Structure formats: C-alpha cells, structure tokens
Amino acid sequence: MEQLGFEGMPRRLYPCTPTRLATWLDCPRRYRMTYLDRPSPPKGPPWGHNSLGASVHNALAGWWRLPLAQRTTAAAGALVDRGWINEGFADETQSVRQRERAIAMVEAYVSLLDPADEPLGVERTVATRTDVIAVSGRIDRLDARPPEPDPAEPGPAEPGPAESGPAESHPAGYGSATAAATELVVVDYKTGRHLLSTDDARGSMALALYALAAGRVLRRPCHRVELHHLPSGQILAWSHTDESLARQLGRAEGIAAECATADEQYRGGLPADRYDEVFPPRLGPGCGWCDYRRHCPEGTAASTPRRPWDGL
C-alpha cells in the first residue's frame, strides 16, 4: 500500500558536518562512496601528509591537557615523538626525517605560547541547528580574547585589526585566552606545504560554521577565525561580521539541501545505472589524491597517480 505524506510537513533536519558538505562540493561520486555506499569501497594506502598532520594535531591537543607545570617546549616535542603515526612514508629514513620536522614545527609553535593561557576548548565539538540543518564539528582550539578594537573609536597609535574585514597575518604565538575575555576565537591548525592567505580564512565555510556554533553554544560573540600554519609560523586571520557568517550559513544550507535530495534518491533504491546522474564525478587536480581513485575510471584517466608521500 502506498504511504501517503502530509503536505506542508517540515522536512527533517539534515545532519551534517562541514567535511561532509565540502566532500559533496568537491566530488559527488566521492561523497557517495564515502557516506552512502555500504560497504564502502576499499580506500587506497594512507597518506604521509595526513599522518604528519594527525601527529601534530594530537600532540598540540595533548600539550594543552598536560598539567600547567609540564607544558614545556620539550614536552610538546616528546608528544609528537611518542604519538608519531608511521604510515604513508617511502621508508623509515623518510619517516624519521618527517618526524624530526614535525617535532621542530611543534616546538617552535608552542615556544611562543603562554602555557597559562588556557583555551576554552581543545578538540571541542560544537553543534547548532537551523530550520534546514543540524551541523556539528570539532574545533582544534577555541580561545577567548578581549574584543578587537572598534576602528571607529579613538585608540592607541597602533590599533589592532578591525572587527570586520581583512585581518593581518601574525607570527605564531599571537595571543590566546585571558580571564577577562568576552569574545571567542576559532583556531584551526594547518600543516600543509602550501602557503595560505587571509582569503583562506575568510572563505572557509567550516571555520564560519564553527564560529556560529561556538557562539550559540557558549552564548558569547564569535566572529574571528584563524588558520595557524605551523610550517611557516604564520597566523592567517579573518574577523567575520554577522552578515558574512549568515552568508556562509546560507551557503551551507543550500549544499545540505542538495545532499539531502541525493541521499533520499540513493536510499530510495536509486538504480546503479543512474548513480552518475545523481552523483557525477567532478574531475580536477584533486583526483590524483582521491582515496577512491582506483574505483573511478574517469578520475584515473584524468589524473596522475600520487605516491603516498608526495604531499609532504
């Protein structure tokens, strides 16, 4: 018997993460293989750059969880050493070299931090919902800072960055939490080899969603987002306005609506010969790095195979 629906009934909130939405944007076929196909197609070998990145992230999170007296530069390096993920490297020599590089990066970074400047959260999960989505994600670090100076008000001779618009690039170690802080700052660690710019911070939908969710969960203003690029020692920052955050949220809702429609078709018994109609491959430079490249004839033909350590 056909099940009748109720006209006007609201659609169920679409649960998602920024990563899920970004995967759909990058390639609907990869999205299907990642989130819908069960069992998922086997992935390729682990990537060395992912191992390095995860090792660094884990060490920085662990450093903040140490007792205050133990938060030393040497302790940060030791956390990298003990937690090193030895996957995706050409050989043991390369792994050792990359581990030493990661230790040096982390030690240089934490040497400019104040160990007593407790973040509000480390690897903190935040979530929020709208009429369309229920979005959640994990923030590398959530700081509390004094409010950015209002450029319309008189201040010292060298005022800080404006509360809205582009922000300056700062050396690593630029400020963290203070007891009297009233604004939240989203911090995201980056370990990739490519240099970043403030445009990367400004355009990141993930960072904007984290800022929105953190502000709502903790009921405090959250407009500033920062990418901390450890290889270069730079911080690329952007201070959102309420309007720019709303635009990013609207963008996320639009992507989620596309995902929800595709998900429903798949789970409703979409024939395999229509997969490419609903989940087409999106070919580009990223095809060479795709975990599912060997399951994608078009991506294989359009890309050069990458070795697991080529991203280091």
Predicted segments with their positions:
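RecB-family 4Fe-4S metal-dependent nuclease core
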Residues: 1-312
